[in-house]
A protein has these predicted regions:
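Conserved, mostly hydrophobic/aromatic
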Residues: 31, 55, 77, 109, ...
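ATP-grasp fold ATP-binding core
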Residues: 137-143
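Charged (often Lys/Glu-rich) extended helix/loop segments that serve as interaction or gating elements
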Residues: 260-261, 265-422
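A charged N-terminal "starter" segment
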Residues: 1-136, 175-179, 183, 217, ...
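Generic beta-strand/beta-sheet core signal
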Residues: 53, 97, 119, 141, ...
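Active-site loop/helix belt of alpha/beta enzymes
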Residues: 130, 144-291
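Flexible loop/turn segments at secondary-structure boundaries
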Residues: 58-61, 102, 125, 147-148, ...
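General structural feature for long, well-ordered alpha-helical segments within catalytic domains
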Residues: 11, 27-30, 34, 38, ...
Length: 422
């Protein structure tokens, strides 16, 4: 089954002349269309806001595109807060969701006026001691435990996740926070990852809406927003059907009208923290075939490796591969597509049926727009690749340069004996 890239071979050949492989390429047109569709799908909710999960793709150029559509930033670390501040996302444009949180991160989040989403009951006292007060607007992360199911399918196992408060802790947290001066409360939950179904958000929403009604009734705390977090996935495999964000939005609306409106809670804002859904399909890793090996298996070695895309090595994740210029040729060759790391799991594909690949062929590895570059690392002394934006007008723009050896050795610059040698 075909799954075609958002860029043509002709376009890519020109881009490669300016930016050598490997690099991550992003599709501005697709990003904009998707952000607009999300905004329209939840336009029925007056307070709706998407907080883009910065961890997925921490690039200010891409986040600024999303900000044109009203998106804020979901941050989970000090440097993500720094990045958000640098692009002008401060105050209620930041949702700070962290766990095992260092004191300095709470201090910085509070300084920026971010909405703080508490992961643990013990963080209430820790936060108050750290910043000297409890913010008037506060959120708590909820974990119901057990398994999360849609129909008879188990989607994930929240009971095994390190995140969030139990039901009892959540009720107690609202009471304690209210007594300490909090006035506007939020509920946050992330119960399944990369779901390719239109049912996940509506089911999660109904559960959280019912919880919100009970919380407000029993604690007297004003529930101002409900954060559905992330979890809406993308079709990595060509045979998968993409989620329909319009259907998802309508499903959440139906639950809202069934549960919150009758309870007199029609002012509750809906927040999301999508990362993969926002950018995943609109990025790809562009690499060249540089080596072939014929032993017990057929191998094609690329100039990219797991440093540039960790998901296949770490999770065994599937990423579709297109051999550019051979989109219509038969997939009659079985290959392992590898990088050059000294690790046998450095493989983008195992036993993948593809057209015959020749040295010098350009390979596009799909769906790397989220958790692609962001999960990069420097094992084996490998350097992270550049990021390039395919603009709406067809031009290509560098939005992050590739690392250099100087970057790699930069943390030794305080030692005189290495200043001139590295």
């Amino acid at each position: 089954m075909h799954k075609l890239p958002f860029v043509t071979k002709k376009q890519l050949d020109e881009i490669i002349k300016e930016f050598p492989t490997p690099f991550h390429l992003y599709d501005e047109k697709g990003i904009r269309e998707n952000a607009k569709a999300l905004k329209e799908a939840f336009a029925w909710n007056k307070g709706f806001k998407e907080y883009f999960a910065v961890k997925a793709t921490p690039n200010p150029f891409l986040i600024n595109i999303l900000r044109e559509y009203g998106c804020g930033c979901d941050c989970s670390s000090y440097t993500e807060l720094m990045l958000s501040e640098a692009i002008g996302a401060v105050g209620k444009d930041i949702m700070f969701s962290s766990n095992a949180t260092p004191a300095e991160e709470f201090v910085y989040a509070d300084k920026l006026g971010a909405i703080i989403n508490l992961d643990d009951f013990t963080h209430i006292d820790f936060l108050e001691k750290t910043i000297g007060h409890i913010p008037e607007t506060i959120s708590c992360r909820y974990n119901p435990g057990g398994f999360f199911q849609i129909s008879n399918d188990i989607m994930d196992n929240p009971g095994d996740a390190k995140y969030g408060m139990t039901t009892e802790q959540l009720f107690e947290a609202f009471k304690v926070l209210k007594a300490k001066g909090a006035k506007n409360f939020g509920i946050h939950a992330f119960l399944a990852s990369n779901t390719v179904t239109n049912d996940y958000y509506p089911i999660l929403a109904k559960m959280l809406f019912e919880l919100a009604v009970k919380l407000q009734a029993e604690t007297g705390a004003h529930v101002a927003f409900i954060n559905l977090s992330g979890g809406i996935g993308i079709p990595y495999r060509p045979e998968q059907t993409p989620n329909d964000i319009k259907v998802i939005g309508e499903g959440v609306r139906k639950a809202y009208e069934e549960v919150l409106i009758p309870a007199g809670m029609g002012d509750v804002a809906i927040y999301t923290e999508l990362g993969r859904y926002m950018l995943g399909p609109y990025g790809c890793l562009v690499t060249k075939a540089v080596h072939e090996k014929h032993t017990h298996k057929e191998y094609i070695g690329c100039d990219a490796c797991a440093v540039n895309l960790m998901r296949p090595a770490m999770y065994g994740a599937y990423h579709h591969i297109t051999v550019m210029g051979k989109e219509n040729e038969p997939c009659d060759h079985k290959y392992d597509i590898t990088g050059s790391l000294c690790e046998n799991n450095d493989k983008f594909a195992v036993d993948r049926m593809l057209p015959k690949i020749n040295i010098g062929d350009t390979l596009v590895i799909h769906d790397t727009g989220a958790h692609g570059f962001a999960m990069g690392y420097n094992y084996n002394g490998k350097l992270k690749s550049a990021e390039v934006l395919l603009c709406e007008d067809g031009t290509a723009k560098l939005i992050r340069r590739a690392e250099t050896p100087k970057d790699y050795f930069a943390t030794f610059d305080c030692f005189e004996e290495f200043k001139e040698k590295l």
